[in-house]
Amino acid sequence: MQVYGISLGYPIPVPLLARPVAAGFPSPADDFIEEEIDLQRLLIVNRPATFLVRVAGDSMIGKGLFNDDLAIVDRSLEPQNGDVVMVDVDGERSFKVWHRQGHRVSLAFANPRYPAFNLSPSAVVEVWGVVSASINPRRRAQRG
């Protein structure tokens, strides 16, 4: 699992179109810009507690995390039921869906192809952080 720090320089404003775009037939009247959004402010709430991790595998596709995505993990967030967390279970780091009922914690895969994840009562669980967002490059930049 590759973990990356975050280097923030100047803001990165990106134009935001005024209207949402349908996934069907496009409207030529919807091409004006409403405002600009700074991707750093949108994706990173607490910089000192945030890092990036490259996703490996397909166990979390039901939560929108795909192989080779970059997960944005925030250590300052307290996990809530249904959150995707980066966790260390008995020395093995992975992403799981978090559930807590009283003092009992359960972790789950988000892919029906995987069997249920059984957390033994003696398991040592350390939450590294909550996945607050992810980056899914649809097309990788060509490097030469």
Predicted regions and their residues:
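Catalytic Cys-His active-site segments of thiol-dependent hydrolases/isopeptidases
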Residues: 106-112
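Short beta-strand-centered aromatic/proline hotspots
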Residues: 83-85, 95-100
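Structural motif
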Residues: 68-69, 83
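A short glycine-leucine-enriched loop at secondary-structure breakpoints
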Residues: 63-66
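Short, charged beta-turn/beta-strand-edge "cap" motif at the junction between a beta-strand
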Residues: 76-79, 91-93
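Short, positionally conserved secondary-structure boundary motifs
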Residues: 1-61, 92-93, 100, 104, ...
